[in-house]
């Protein structure tokens, strides 16, 4: 009986988080009340307070169910970039993986959209803002370490200070994803992301990566008539 009660409680918690995701995306965070979420989940407002302290606590729990693009990049480069065989390639791979997951995983895409386009940082949401800033700062600090390790490994001096380089890369990727979320059909997130990242890194002084040329159709040679 105890096991079933725990399972039911966990199912209710996930149901509330699922409902919150849907409503936050449709209405925005500030326009969605806890009662709205309870009704959408088919439960009571009291059930929400059993699992979450307030809307900010619920929001952070929703965020913790996915690994967002920034965190994907952070996790993909390890704790000690200087130990990596190829720090720059590890960074490229981590960014590519983050963009791929954003483009293909519906929940990741939905939560990132909510976190960047549907939330207003006021009142009880200040804790959410603090979490967002901490994630951003951690990502930029790690990116700076990777860029510096790559520059040291290749004997390069970056074109700009490493902190500025990390900030620029973060702003570019973050802005790229946000623009794609506004109109996913406007461009291919993964292909465009790969191109702009390689171009940006080349601008910092790293050797450029040869991009595959677009395929062109070969013209068929006209058949020659045999001479009589």
Language-model features: where?
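Basic, helix-initiating cap at the start of DNA-binding domains
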Residues: 1-27, 31-43, 56-60, 221, ...
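Short hydrophobic/aromatic patch on the recognition helix
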Residues: 42-52
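Alpha-helical DNA-contacting segments of helix-turn-helix folds
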Residues: 52, 60-66, 73
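Hydrophobic alpha-helical connector segments
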Residues: 61, 75-110, 162-169, 215-221
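Amphipathic alpha-helical packing segments from all-alpha helical-bundle domains
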Residues: 71, 75, 85, 89-92, ...
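Amphipathic alpha-helical segments used for helix-helix packing
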Residues: 90, 104-130
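Amphipathic C-terminal alpha-helical segment
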Residues: 101-104, 121, 145, 166-187, ...
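C-terminal effector-binding regulatory domain of bacterial HTH transcription factors
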Residues: 207-228
């Amino acid at each position: 009986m105890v096991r079933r009660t725990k399972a039911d409680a966990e199912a209710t918690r996930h149901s509330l988080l699922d409902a919150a995701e849907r409503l936050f995306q449709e209405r925005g965070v500030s326009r969605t009340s806890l009662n709205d979420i309870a009704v959408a989940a088919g439960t009571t407002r009291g059930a929400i307070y059993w699992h979450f302290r307030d809307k900010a606590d619920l929001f952070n729990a929703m965020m913790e169910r996915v690994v967002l693009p920034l965190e994907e990049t952070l996790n993909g480069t390890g704790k000690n970039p200087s130990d990596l065989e190829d720090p720059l390639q590890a960074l490229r791979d981590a960014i590519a993986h983050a963009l791929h997951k954003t483009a293909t995983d519906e929940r990741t895409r939905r939560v990132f959209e909510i976190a960047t386009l549907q939330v207003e940082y006021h009142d009880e949401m200040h804790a959410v803002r603090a979490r967002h800033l901490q994630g951003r700062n951690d990502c930029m600090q790690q990116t700076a370490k990777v860029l510096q390790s790559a520059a040291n490994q290749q004997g390069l001096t970056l074109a700009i200070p490493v902190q500025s380089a990390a900030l620029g890369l973060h702003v570019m990727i973050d802005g790229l994803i946000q623009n794609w979320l506004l109109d996913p059909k406007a461009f291919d997130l993964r292909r465009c992301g790969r191109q702009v990242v390689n171009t940006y890194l080349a601008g910092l002084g790293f050797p450029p990566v040869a991009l595959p040329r677009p395929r062109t159709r070969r013209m068929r040679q006209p058949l020659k008539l045999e001479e009589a």
